[in-house]
């Protein structure tokens, strides 16, 4: 009887990881790389007018000003001040999508809801069978994953593609014609096993950036938990192989230039 893909409770990839059964063991938490004294020394001074400090978005080490009530917020912005939470605006048809684009707002969190959130959004308390991501879970995990706004489309594409794979049986994987989706499944499988061995020490990894048709976006990037964006490079959409002459950079590698040259 083939196994069925299900969501593992990773704090990094809450809806992306793979439940591989008892052979893998209990899921291990993913955490940012430790903040060394050298990294902390590079932090810019915080303005004296800042009423409240909060952790940096992503895996940055530098403190920053918390966002006040009503401020625009999202997964790649600063965090909301104590007692507030970043929520999609009322009536927003795609609340999670809005948060990935910084279109939420810092709103008051009722005390009873704050207690519930603390109890339920912890990765250890998320059911592996759950296919739903709450706004709180999205923010908790994407704040860790997304070092910059450039990371968000890649991470969101990975979630969207994995959602389309979750209901498929492992025995079907070899039959898939879509190369990027095949690789995404294999990468998630490998990462789940590597994380069990590495514990908290796996700070960089690569997730294939697939389009809705299962092929590759020309821009591919690694995810880094070391406080700075990972490297990005350009690939051929049909194969995922790096384009000859393309250079891996931190930021936008401007992949379209290579296709313009070919045309």
UniProtKB/Swiss-Prot annotation:
Grouped into one coarse class, the protein's main location is secreted
Residues bearing PTM Phosphoserine:
122, 127, 130, 148, 160, 246
Question: What Gene Ontology terms describe what this protein does at the molecular function level?
Answer: insulin-like growth factor I binding; insulin-like growth factor II binding
Kindly indicate whether the keyword Membrane belongs to this entry: no
Q: Looking at the keywords, is Disulfide bond present? A: yes
SUPFAM superfamilies xrefs: Growth factor receptor domain (SSF57184), Thyroglobulin type-1 domain (SSF57610)
Q: Ranges for the IGFBP N-terminal domain?
A: 28-109
- Which region is the signal sequence? 1-25
Q: Where is the composition biased (Polar residues)?
A: 122-131
**Cellular-component GO terms for this entry:** extracellular space; Golgi apparatus
The protein in question is named Insulin-like growth factor-binding protein 1
InterPro entries named among the record's database cross-references: Growth_fac_rcpt_cys_sf, IGFBP-like, IGFBP1, IGFBP_1-6_chordata, Insulin_GF-bd_Cys-rich_CS, Thyroglobulin_1, Thyroglobulin_1_sf
Q: Give one Pfam family, short name only.
A: IGFBP
Q: Which organism is it from?
A: Bos taurus (Bovine)
**Cystine pairings recorded for this chain:** 32-59, 35-61, 43-62, 50-65, 73-86, 80-106, 180-210, 221-232, 234-255
Residue ranges occupied by any Thyroglobulin type-1 domain in the UniProt entry: 177-255
Query: Which segment of this protein is annotated as the motif Cell attachment site?
Result: 250-252
Gene3D superfamilies reported for this sequence:
4.10.40.20, Thyroglobulin type-1
Gene Ontology BP terms: regulation of insulin-like growth factor receptor signaling pathway; response to insulin
Could you tell me where this protein is found in the cell?
Answer: Secreted
């Amino acid at each position: 009887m083939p196994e069925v893909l299900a969501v593992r409770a990773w704090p990094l990839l809450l809806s992306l990881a793979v439940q591989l059964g008892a052979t893998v063991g209990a899921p291990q938490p993913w955490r940012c790389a430790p903040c060394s004294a050298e990294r902390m020394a590079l932090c810019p001074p915080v303005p004296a007018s800042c009423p409240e400090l909060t952790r940096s978005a992503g895996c940055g080490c530098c403190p920053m000003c918390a966002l006040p009530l009503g401020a625009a917020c999202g997964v790649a912005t600063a965090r909301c001040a104590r007692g507030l939470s970043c929520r999609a605006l009322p009536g927003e048809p795609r609340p999670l999508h809005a948060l990935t684009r910084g279109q939420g707002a810092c709103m008051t969190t009722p005390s009873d809801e704050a207690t519930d959130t603390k109890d339920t959004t912890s990765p250890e308390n998320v059911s592996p069978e759950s296919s739903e991501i709450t706004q709180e879970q999205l923010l908790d995990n994407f704040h860790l994953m997304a070092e910059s706004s450039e990371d968000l489309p890649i991470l969101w594409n990975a979630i969207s593609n994995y959602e389309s794979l979750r209901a498929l049986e492992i025995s079907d994987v070899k039959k898939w014609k879509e190369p990027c989706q095949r690789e995404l499944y294999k990468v998630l499988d490998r990462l789940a096993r590597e994380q069990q061995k590495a514990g908290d020490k796996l700070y960089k990894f690569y997730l294939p950036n697939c389009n809705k048709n299962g092929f590759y976006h020309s821009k591919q990037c690694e995810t880094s938990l070391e406080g700075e964006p990972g490297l990005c490079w350009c690939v051929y959409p049909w194969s995922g192989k790096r384009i000859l002459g393309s250079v891996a950079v931190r930021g936008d590698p401007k992949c379209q230039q290579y296709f313009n040259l070919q045309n």
